[in-house]
Amino acid sequence: MNSLQVLTKKVLIENKAFSNYHEDDVFILQQLELWWENGPIGFCKQCKMVTSGSMSCSDVDSYELDRALVKAVKKNQTDLIKLFVLWGANINYGIICAKMERTKVLCIQLGADPTFLEVGLYTMFVDLFKQQKVLLAIDIYYENIPILDSFDSHDFYALINFIYNRYILYLDEKEEMTRNTLVLKFWFKIAIEFNLIKPIRFLSKKFPHLDDWRLKMAVYLGNVDEIHHAYFQENIRLDPNHMMSLACMYPQNKLGIYYCFALGANINTALETLIRFINHEVDREITFFSNYGIWSNVHFCISLGANPYIKKIQETLLREEKNVIMKLFFKKGLLTSHSILHKKILEPGEVRKIISTYEYTETFHSFSSLRDNLR
């Protein structure tokens, strides 16, 4: 049962009773747990967002209700915990972050499953991933060493690898990452992959030391919106050829490859990088050529103007028996640049239009040429 004090706070906050306050009121509001970040606490019932002062629901610093609960639990703010649960927050998120025994007891009294810490950790991790709740996941796991340590080592890394290959997470890392850093990068990567603007901006602001890695991740995943934002609005710069080498490694990454090309990367160097990678996979006796995605990158680089008739590239293209169409195109001299890609455009929306048009026409362009040459 909620106290009269909690219910009173609920009514006052929902009716924005503290929208106009005097500086002398700040201390009192803080003592009454009616202060959030830099202003009086606010709550939007429609968006389920907790705000501060004049902050809007869409503000990068506004909190989803479950995130607000986690923060209140970490600070042992009893009335706010009760209030957020009253508004509909999931108390199981709270018990994971409770550091004091009395706070854990309160969470259980409010409906948390006392066995959740033993049986619910992996399920929650996967559920947060499915729902793309990046910021909530970071609030729960980042710097929550007891919880991270409670994961079985093998299962923890298997979980990360199951959802995502760890290769890109280790860019810029010279030694094995701590679980803490790995979790942070993992969820940051999810935000970039799905272009979750608010989480990206929030994490960029909070973790500026990851700026270069963020740009590399955006290139690798072909997120042209984030590449454009980092490159032109934040002035985060990397060598375009280095960026291109990352773009080429992600299957069917036309957006990333094109954007690096438009920034000035050498497209012949990109094709050579792909060929070296393909040959490396052959040496390791991995059946990599069945991977259409990487061969799609090869074809796209050629469409951008890369020269496929260099000896080393010829040998690779002719040796690959599984890529019959690519081999046939090569023998007939049909691997040429595509006219629609001649312009170098950097505005993300226009880039997507160009790639969309290219994808619509490339098959007809190639097979039409093949038909004419085989007559």
UniProtKB/Swiss-Prot annotation:
Pfam families: ASFV_360
Biological role: Plays a role in virus cell tropism, and may be required for efficient virus replication in macrophages.
GO biological process assignments: taxis
Entry's family note: Belongs to the asfivirus MGF 360 family.
Lineage of origin: Viruses, Varidnaviria, Bamfordvirae, Nucleocytoviricota, Pokkesviricetes
Protein name as catalogued: Protein MGF 360-6L
